[in-house]
């Protein structure tokens, strides 16, 4: 049912993180979010990394995803997780149908199915 997992990394300074991932490590930018950009999806070969700088020093942080998992059938997963602390599934504007599960330690794990 799972097809891949993607780490979600926090960054204090998105432009600095973007430069590191692209110029130092050679990743390409797949998508970015925010204006100015504060979230990016970076790709190299078959690897993908999400970098999230949504919460600056002057913002109150909310729990962020800790990992992102691609799945083939999000609705079947939602049914299997009945009774767990689950948010969603919900269709997103970026072409994914996602749900979030919170583990016993408060880590938010996002599962998504491509619906684009």
Where are these regions (language model features)?
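Residue-level marker for the onset of beta-strands and adjacent loop->beta junctions
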Residues: 5, 36-38, 65, 97
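N-terminal beta-strand motif that seeds the catalytic metal site of vicinal oxygen chelate
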Residues: 1-18, 67, 114-116
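Short secondary-structure junctions
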Residues: 26-32, 84-88
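Conserved short beta-strand elements that form part of the metal-binding/catalytic scaffold
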Residues: 28-63, 108-113
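Short glycine-enriched loop/turn motifs at secondary-structure junctions
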Residues: 1-3, 59-64, 93
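Vicinal oxygen chelate
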Residues: 12-14, 67-108
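Amphipathic alpha-helical segments
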Residues: 15-28
């Amino acid at each position: 049912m799972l097809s891949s997992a993607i780490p979600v990394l926090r960054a204090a300074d998105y432009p600095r993180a973007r430069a590191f991932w692209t110029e130092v490590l050679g990743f390409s930018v797949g998508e970015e979010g925010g204006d100015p950009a504060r979230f990016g999806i970076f790709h190299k070969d078959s690897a993908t990394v999400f970098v999230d700088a949504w919460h600056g020093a002057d913002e109150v942080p909310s729990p962020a995803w800790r990992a992102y998992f691609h799945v083939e059938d999000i609705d079947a997963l939602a049914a299997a997780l009945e009774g767990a602390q689950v948010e969603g599934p919900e269709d997103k504007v970026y072409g994914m149908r996602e749900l979030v599960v919170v583990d016993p330690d408060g880590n938010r794990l996002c599962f998504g199915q491509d619906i684009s």
